[in-house]
């Protein structure tokens, strides 16, 4: 990214763009993704793009390995916690666990998958999660509410819905 940023700024500056999108960032990452100091310097390059071009910088990143459902949206990013603390806004898409039977009953297409969009916003209240179907190549908001009680892998609510034995989560008992 260190070499890309000056070129990017020259090309984008004074062009009237609203945003620069870098997808995915792992292809331009400089330094160790798990090192906070190195990722802080890396993320400062995004600020430089914003400052010098007047554009927002949007980047796409991936989740860490393993089940993500028990984590907050801001804690799912792979690598250093800088990826949770640096952005002014994070949008996180997570796939929901849907059975074949559920898909048959609720989706328009048998190849569709259920997803949830969550956010973490620095200056504003977070919006409510948005559920949607991904039916290649289109994302469609779930207007029926069928995905409201479906959860991502690792979410404790998912385990409760499967067992049917308890209606409380550890958080609700506090």
Give the location of each predicted region.
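Conserved alpha/beta core segments of nucleic-acid transaction machinery
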Residues: 122-174
